[in-house]
């Protein structure tokens, strides 16, 4: 079973509106602090988070105790302008675990499988056409991946640049995902007990493909 934690900033929209129309610089600074705390607190316990919508955060929490998740959430709460709540869901896939997110005492024991994907030749394209061209490409790619992931049970998130992260149900699923997109990509896939270790392995696989100037998939177990 895979585990997903969803963290909610309750009353966040109302808080933003209370700041008045000259508020966006305040909101962005608060979001940056919460983002930094999210990554520090969750990766410290071995989980893999993402800022998601900023009023909601998400994390892969396979083999992370509910107590450790609660402790990470508490650290974020210290910097939040509104109360924070969370749930943990489990399922046969990361996507089903997300849909099942209700309780707080649930723990998942499956190995974590994470992919780190980038677009082939994005650096060259950026030099030729500027950063907006690659940015628009990655937005379209993520839109496609979101639809594909619903079918295969994965979750996808934008990391910045031309990089995306995917929480996968099995290592082999990445083959089907790549077949369903029309973009040349490199993908490192990591398998480990804890999610952040899986992501580190995925990045190692991606770095190997980059250093050898290859595209395709590299699985690191």
From Swiss-Prot:
Pfam families: GCH_III. The keyword Nucleotide-binding applies. Its EC number is 3.5.4.29. It comes from the Archaea. It catalyses: GTP + 3 H2O = 2-amino-5-formylamino-6-(5-phospho-D-ribosylamino)pyrimidin-4(3H)-one + 2 phosphate + 2 H(+). InterPro entries: GTP_CycHdrlase_3, Nucleotide_cyclase, Rev_trsase/Diguanyl_cyclase. Keywords: GTP-binding, Hydrolase, Nucleotide-binding. GO terms for molecular function: GTP binding; GTP cyclohydrolase IIa activity. One of its GO terms (biological process) is biosynthetic process. Belongs to the archaeal-type GTP cyclohydrolase family. Catalyzes the formation of 2-amino-5-formylamino-6-ribofuranosylamino-4(3H)-pyrimidinone ribonucleotide monophosphate and inorganic phosphate from GTP. Also has an independent pyrophosphate phosphohydrolase activity. This is GTP cyclohydrolase III. The lineage of its organism: Archaea, Thermoproteota, Thermoprotei, Thermoproteales, Thermoproteaceae.
């Amino acid at each position: 079973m895979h585990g997903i934690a969803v963290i909610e900033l309750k009353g966040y929209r109302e808080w933003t509106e209370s700041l008045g129309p000259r508020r966006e610089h305040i909101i962005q600074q608060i979001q940056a602090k919460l983002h930094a705390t999210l990554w520090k607190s969750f990766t410290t316990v071995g989980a893999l988070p993402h800022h998601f919508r900023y009023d909601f955060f998400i994390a892969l929490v396979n083999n992370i105790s509910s107590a450790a998740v609660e402790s990470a959430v508490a650290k974020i709460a210290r910097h939040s302008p509104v109360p924070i709540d969370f749930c943990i869901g489990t399922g046969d896939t990361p996507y089903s675990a997300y849909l099942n997110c209700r309780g707080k005492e649930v723990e998942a024991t499956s190995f974590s499988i994470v992919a780190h994907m980038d677009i082939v030749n994005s650096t060259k394209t950026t030099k030729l056409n500027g950063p907006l061209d690659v940015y628009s490409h990655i937005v379209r790619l993520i839109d496609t991946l979101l639809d594909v992931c619903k079918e295969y049970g994965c979750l996808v998130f934008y990391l910045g640049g031309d990089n995306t992260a995917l929480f996968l149900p099995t290592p082999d699923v990445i083959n089907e995902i790549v077949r369903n997109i029309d973009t040349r990509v490199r993908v490192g896939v990591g398998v480990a007990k804890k999610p952040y270790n899986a992501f580190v392995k995925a990045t190692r696989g991606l770095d190997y493909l980059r250093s050898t100037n290859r595209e395709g998939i590299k699985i690191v177990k």
